[in-house]
Regions:
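Acidic helix N-cap motif at the loop->helix transition within catalytic regions
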Residues: 19, 33, 44-52, 94, ...
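Membrane-interface aromatic/basic loop that binds lipid-linked glycans or pyrophosphate carriers
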Residues: 264-319
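N-proximal low-complexity "stem/linker" segments adjacent to membrane-targeting elements
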Residues: 1-26
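Short aromatic/hydrophobic "clamp" motif used to bind/position activated sugar donors
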Residues: 86
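Donor-binding/catalytic cores of nucleotide-activated saccharide
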Residues: 91-197, 208-221
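A conserved acidic beta->alpha catalytic loop
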Residues: 24, 31, 39-48, 66, ...
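Glycine-rich, basic loop-to-helix element that forms the pyrophosphate-binding segment
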Residues: 65-81
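Catalytic core of nucleotide-sugar-dependent glycosyltransferases
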Residues: 204-210, 216-242, 257-286
C-alpha cells in the first residue's frame, strides 16, 4: 500500500481543537498523506497554527482564503488535491491512529470505490484503546444498495469524515455552497458514481459533539440549507420511481426538523407558511395507504395536524 491519500481539513474558529486534530492526522500509522489545511479566513489564531504545522511536517500544505464557508473551503482543496484517494476531517474532530491504514486496506482488499467506517461520538475525548473491543467486520456491497439510505439522509452515509473516496470516482464533483448539509448531496452523487463500497464497523474517527459547532448550534438561517440539500436529491430522482419515494421522505424529514426548530426557538416564524407548503406538497405520498415507504402513524398524525390546524401544530410542538 503506497497510494497517496489527500486529507482535507477545513479550518474556521477551531483554535481550541486544531492541534489535536492535525496531530492525529500526522500520527497516522499510514504515512503517505497529503494533508491540506484550508484556513477559511478564520479570525483567531488558526491561520498561524496552520502555518506552524506546515513548518513541522512537509506533508502539510496550507491554503489561506477569504471566508466563504466550509463547502467552498473543501472544494478549493479538492481542486488542488493530488491523492489517489480523498479523505475529509473536520477541524474540531480527530482520527484514531489506524484510520487511513484500515480504510485504505479495506478499499484495496475489497476492490471498492468508497471505504467507510463507524465512528465514536462524544463531547469527552477518548483514546483508541478505550473503545469497546468488538470483532471487526467489513461488508462489501453495491453502492446502489445504500442509495435509499443516502436519499433519506441516514447520518452515517451523509457525512464525509468516516469515508475514503477513490479520487477518480469523485473527480470534478463539488459540494453545493450551503452552510450546512452540503456533504449530503456530495455523498449522494459520489455513491451514484461508485460501483462497490466497503462498510466497516470499526470506530476509526472521533466526532466531537459540541453545542457551539456549525451543526449543533442554535437554530439560525443556515439551518434552511438542510432543506436545500434534500431538494437537490429530490430533483435528481424525480424521474426515478425506485428512489423518488426515499428522496421525498428525506425532504419531508428535513422540513419537519426545520419547522420544529423554528417553533422551538421562535425564530424565522415568518417562513412558517413556506416550510409548511413544502411539506403539504407531499401529503398524498405520506397519507395514502399503499406507498413504497410505510410512514409511522405518528408522522402521519403530524402531517394531518399541520394540514388541518397549523395553530394546533405549533402549540403541540412547543409543549
Amino acid at each position: 500500500m503506497n497510494q497517496l491519500i489527500s486529507v482535507i481539513v477545513p479550518v474556521y474558529k477551531v483554535e481550541q481543537y486544531l492541534d489535536r486534530c492535525v496531530q492525529s492526522i500526522v500520527n497516522q500509522t499510514y504515512k503517505n498523506l497529503e494533508i491540506i489545511l484550508v484556513d477559511d479566513g478564520s479570525p483567531d489564531n488558526c491561520p498561524a497554527m496552520c502555518d506552524a504545522w506546515a513548518e513541522k511536517d512537509s506533508r502539510i500544505r496550507v491554503i489561506h482564503k477569504a471566508n466563504e464557508g466550509v463547502a467552498i473551503a473543501r472544494n478549493t482543496a479538492l481542486s488542488q488535491a493530488k491523492g489517489t484517494y480523498i479523505g475529509f476531517v473536520d477541524g474540531d474532530d480527530y482520527c484514531f491512529p489506524d484510520m487511513y491504514a484500515h480504510l485504505l486496506q479495506n478499499a484495496l482488499q475489497q476492490d471498492v470505490d468508497i471505504s467507510m467506517s463507524s465512528y465514536y461520538e462524544s463531547d469527552v475525548e477518548v483514546e483508541a484503546d478505550a473503545l469497546t473491543n468488538v470483532p471487526v467486520t467489513v461488508e462489501k456491497m453495491k453502492a446502489q444498495a445504500v442509495l435509499p439510505q443516502v436519499c433519506i439522509g441516514d447520518y452515517a452515509f451523509g457525512v464525509l469524515w468516516n469515508k475514503l473516496y477513490k479520487a477518480s470516482v469523485v473527480s470534478g464533483l463539488e459540494m453545493p455552497p450551503l452552510h450546512c448539509s452540503q456533504d449530503l448531496p456530495y455523498n449522494y452523487f459520489a455513491f451514484k458514481r461508485a460501483n462497490m463500497i466497503a462498510i466497516s464497523n470499526e470506530q476509526l474517527y472521533f466526532y466531537r459533539n459540541r453545542s457551539t459547532s456549525t451543526t449543533t448550534s442554535k437554530f439560525k438561517s443556515g439551518s434552511f440549507d438542510a432543506i436545500k440539500a434534500r431538494d437537490i436529491i429530490l430533483n435528481a430522482e424525480k424521474n426515478n420511481p425506485a428512489l423518488y419515494p426515499y428522496a421525498i421522505q428525506g425532504y419531508l424529514n428535513a422540513n419537519f426538523a426545520v419547522l420544529s426548530g423554528m417553533i422551538a426557538s421562535n425564530m424565522f416564524m415568518e417562513r412558517f407558511d413556506e416550510v409548511r407548503s413544502n411539506i403539504l406538497k407531499y401529503k398524498k405520498q405520506m397519507l395514502q395507504k399503499k406507498t413504497a415507504i410505510q410512514y409511522a402513524n405518528r408522522d402521519k398524525a403530524k402531517m394531518l395536524i399541520l394540514w388541518l390546524s397549523p395553530k394546533l401544530f405549533i402549540r403541540m410542538t412547543r409543549k
